[in-house]
Amino acid sequence: CELFINGDYRGVYVLMEKIKRDNNRIDIEELNSDETEGDDLTGGYILKFDWGGTGENNGGFNSEYDGNLYNYHYPKPDEIAEEQEEYIYQFIYDFETIMVSPNYNDIETGYSNITNIGSFVDMIILQELSKNVDAYRLSTYIYKNIDSVDGKLTAGPIWDLNHGYGNCDYGETWLTDGWLIEYNPEGGDQMTFWWGKIWEDE
């Protein structure tokens, strides 16, 4: 929105709500630290791709395949139980194992069986339209609900577009051609490999 204060123009601002588990935000099951077995253990979880060791990003795990960091967003790092850490780590490991296989997009055994594909497609479309330089790598969320409701991995919601729509002096994001998903800089904030695999899937 464009902000004016007492008739004085103050610029363009992007207003966004914080990402959190809530019936009116990310509507997944509440996961308490004592829920460590059965269906209760399967959700809900919110993971975030972002810089490690900054702000609330002080707990998580690294991918066994490309080393990228999955930050715990919900439950928080100081609230997640060991069994819950083991569960979500194994779920992501199983997902990534499918994604590195040559048959990752097989209708019967591929990633479509454990992901909400539409949410990943929506995420890619929105990130590409906004040319958000942080896309896929930073301020990017995925979540998993409890199995008895919908245990598939889901992308989103989209968040933090302050470097979108050409409002950035790197990554050539001001250009109206080309694909942002092909921008993957070196330096510790790489895009995890499976975004490219989803992009390539016909």
Label every model-predicted segment.
Residues 1-202:
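Phosphate/dinucleotide-binding and metal-coordinating scaffold of catalytic cores
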